[in-house]
């Protein structure tokens, strides 16, 4: 159906998983099925993966590698992430039917930057906001609820005696 439509671009998240996907020993895997369609221009695909996974997996399949072009997306800065959060906080708060304390965005960015180094901005900050609002039973999301979320979801024990409002 995608081939017949001609105006469809497929998006495959974690595209590195198509190599060897569904292929038992000696069988055709997903990447080998799509290669002819890609080479003839019958389908267009955008895939997302990390640079490390791309190099690890696509480097083993030269034919597939030459059918894709790398587009690097840099991680957002702390400042850009805070700008994004400031837009999203009222939207998420309304969705969850909660209010949010002043300064929560900056606090979330600080927590994400310091305690979740293996994840990327803005995703890690948005996840903290989303998870904290989902977990809290109170009407107001405060620093304490963020601390509770960080402990419960991310297993990060923030210092409960520190005055985070001064960040």
PLM features: residue spans?
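AAA+ P-loop NTPase nucleotide-binding core of proteostasis motors
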Residues: 1-167
């Amino acid at each position: 159906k995608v081939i017949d439509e001609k105006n469809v671009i497929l998006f495959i998240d974690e595209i590195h998983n198509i190599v060897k996907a569904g292929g038992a020993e000696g069988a055709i895997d997903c990447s080998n099925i799509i290669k002819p369609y890609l080479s003839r221009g019958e389908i267009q695909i955008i895939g997302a993966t990390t640079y490390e996974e791309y190099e690890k997996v696509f480097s083993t399949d030269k034919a597939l590698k030459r059918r894709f072009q790398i587009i690097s997306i840099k991680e957002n800065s702390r400042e850009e992430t805070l700008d994004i959060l400031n837009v999203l906080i009222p939207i998420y708060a309304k969705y969850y039917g909660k209010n949010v304390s002043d300064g929560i965005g900056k606090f979330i960015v600080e927590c994400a930057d310091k305690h979740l180094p293996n994840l990327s901005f803005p995703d890690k900050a948005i996840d903290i906001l989303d998870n904290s609002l989902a977990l809290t039973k109170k009407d107001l999301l405060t620093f304490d609820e963020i601390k509770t979320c960080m402990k419960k979801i991310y297993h990060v024990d923030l210092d409960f005696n520190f005055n985070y409002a001064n960040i």
